[in-house]
Amino acid sequence: MAVRASFENNCEIGCFAKLTNTYCLVAIGGSENFYSVFEGELSDTIPVVHASIAGCRIIGRMCVGNRHGLLVPNNTTDQELQHIRNSLPDTVQIRRVEERLSALGNVTTCNDYVALVHPDLDRETEEILADVLKVEVFRQTVADQVLVGSYCVFSNQGGLVHPKTSIEDQDELSSLLQVPLVAGTVNRGSEVIAAGMVVNDWCAFCGLDTTSTELSVVESVFKLNEAQPSTIATSMRDSLIDSLT
């Protein structure tokens, strides 16, 4: 299902959390409320871990990961690395990466099989990505934006891309990723999708400003609650009526 949350009144929750099918990292600090939203939905299935990366709370923008592994920038401290290692399942490989574009979450995005990366990403980083996360890597742009990690979010079920992505680009990306894609927004019209939401194969968290229409699109394209695209129209109608009453 899709749940709304905010971090210290900030709706850009994708900056403060990293969610995969085997673990969830949540920024330290913030209200206990933010952590408990994730804990409530996920704690039965995967570990929810308080963390910071390179002294920053914007962990969602600093790292990239999937069920196989997690890559963090080179300036992550030993203490932070050790804490994350101890908290995640043993099957998850964790690696530091020396990369000029150090906000890895902005320049890369992936599910458990495929990764999209910034066209200028180091060749070595690309190899580490393929090796640690066990993914096929493609250098791509989304709606002519090089920050692929900011403007699209996808799971193994589906994906949401920048609202100005052309139909041709959507088709190309969809065939690379092998999942259905929809162009859309979160947080009442925000184009920076990855900053406003996190998702895995069964659960999504969106910023508090996300409208019920946006939420129903998210639930449908990511196949949460077994929602199918055909149900978008009916659930949208219901949610529009909800928001108008």
From Swiss-Prot:
Tell me the protein's name.
Eukaryotic translation initiation factor 6
Q: Which organism does this record belong to?
A: Homo sapiens (Human)
Q: What gene name does this entry carry?
A: EIF6
HAMAP family in the record: eIF_6
UniProt superkingdom: Eukaryota
Q: GO cellular component annotations, sorted alphabetically?
A: cytoplasm; cytosol; extracellular exosome; lamin filament; nucleolus; nucleoplasm; nucleus; synapse
Q: Tell me which family the UniProt entry assigns to this protein.
A: Belongs to the eIF-6 family.
- Record PTM Phosphothreonine, positions in chain: 165
Let me know which tissues express this protein, per UniProt. Answer: Expressed at very high levels in colon carcinoma with lower levels in normal colon and ileum and lowest levels in kidney and muscle (at protein level).
- Cite the InterPro entries for this sequence: eIF6
Ordered alphabetically, the record's keywords are: Cytoplasm, Initiation factor, Nucleus, Phosphoprotein, Protein biosynthesis, Ribosome biogenesis, Ubl conjugation
Broad class of where this protein is predominantly found: cytoplasm
Q: How is it modified after translation?
A: Phosphorylation at Ser-174 and Ser-175 by CSNK1D/CK1 promotes nuclear export. Ufmylated by UFL1.
Cited function: Binds to the 60S ribosomal subunit and prevents its association with the 40S ribosomal subunit to form the 80S initiation complex in the cytoplasm. Behaves as a stimulatory translation initiation factor downstream insulin/growth factors. Is also involved in ribosome biogenesis. Associates with pre-60S subunits in the nucleus and is involved in its nuclear export. Cytoplasmic release of TIF6 from 60S subunits and nuclear relocalization is promoted by a RACK1 (RACK1)-dependent protein kinase C activity.
Q: Summarize the subunit comment.
A: Monomer. Associates with the 60S ribosomal subunit. Interacts with RACK1. Interacts with DICER1, AGO2, TARBP2, MOV10 and RPL7A; they form a large RNA-induced silencing complex (RISC).
Query: Where are the Phosphoserine modifications?
Result: 166, 174-175, 235, 239, 243
Q: Where in the cell is it found?
A: Cytoplasm; Nucleus, Nucleolus
List Phosphotyrosine occurrences by residue: 113
| Single GO term (MF) | ribosome binding
Question: Can you supply a Gene Ontology BP term from the record?
Answer: maturation of 5.8S rRNA
